[in-house]
Amino acid sequence: MAKLILATFAVVFMALAATSLAGDPDMLQDVCVADYKSLKGPLRLNGFPCKRIENVTANDFFFDGLMKAGNTGNAVGSVVTAASVESLPGLNTMGVSMARIDYAPWGLNPPHTHPRATEIIFVVEGSLDVGFVTTANKLFTRTVCKGEVFVFPRGLVHFQKNNGNTPAFAIAALNSQLPGTQSIAAALFGAAPPLPSDTLARAFQVDGGMVEFIKSKFVPPKY
């Protein structure tokens, strides 16, 4: 009996562990096209409610937003165009998404994390200096050229920088329909309400005036 209980516990534990390692929960039907209209009501859940199957069309599984380069005319010189469940409703419950990342010459996709997904990028044009930092603060970095691939582990801080004087772009794949993106600088210096300046000053070991100067570069979101 003891062996049976132990074996049962082991099987249950392994099943739970496998589920916890998945990027998104497994789908329970062929398709579950996101019904954005339902979000205006009281219904809230981890994901999106399904559109009625009789209202689903092929267009729910189509997105042409990655065809053209995005506008990189901003302070960091990069822009991300996401093909996630928010723009491609047919991705709901599929556990995957894509993105196009465009870089101006010397443009930077600043240090950020994806809390819900691992990311793999394929460089289509140009050459990028990329890297990620582990929880032990070890940096893994290298140059990735046209036709090459690099992977960023889930939840770790990472970046990409165009190291050339011509535009570059890459295609990213992620194992979540909505991986989430948190820019480190914007999260710390552009939060709403703002983080206390004395907290940031002590964390970065600088004076309060420097913190206020950096905060002035970020526009807090409006809720």
Curated annotation (Swiss-Prot):
InterPro entries, per database record: Cupin_1 (IPR006045), Germin (IPR001929), Germin_Mn-BS (IPR019780), RmlC-like_jellyroll (IPR014710), RmlC_Cupin_sf (IPR011051)
Protein name listed in UniProt: Germin-like protein 1-3
| Keywords of this entry | Apoplast, Disulfide bond, Glycoprotein, Manganese, Metal-binding, Secreted, Signal
Report the locations given in the UniProt record: Secreted, Extracellular space, Apoplast
Residue positions with a glycan: 55
Kindly name one Pfam family recorded for this protein.
Answer: Cupin_1
Q: Which SUPFAM superfamilies match?
A: RmlC-like cupins (SSF51182)
Instruction: Please list the GO biological process terms of this entry.
Output: plasmodesmata-mediated intercellular transport; regulation of root development
GO molecular function terms listed in the Swiss-Prot or TrEMBL record: manganese ion binding
* Cystine pairings recorded for this chain: 32-50
Q: Which residues bind Mn(2+)?
A: 112, 114, 119, 158
A single Gene Ontology CC annotation of this entry is:
plasmodesma
Q: Subunit structure, per the record?
A: Oligomer (believed to be a pentamer but probably hexamer).
Q: Signal peptide: which range, if any?
A: 1-22
Q: Which function does this protein serve?
A: May play a role in plant defense. Probably has no oxalate oxidase activity even if the active site is conserved.
**Boundaries of every Cupin type-1 domain copy:** 64-212
Family the UniProt entry places it in: Belongs to the germin family.
Entry keyword Manganese: yes
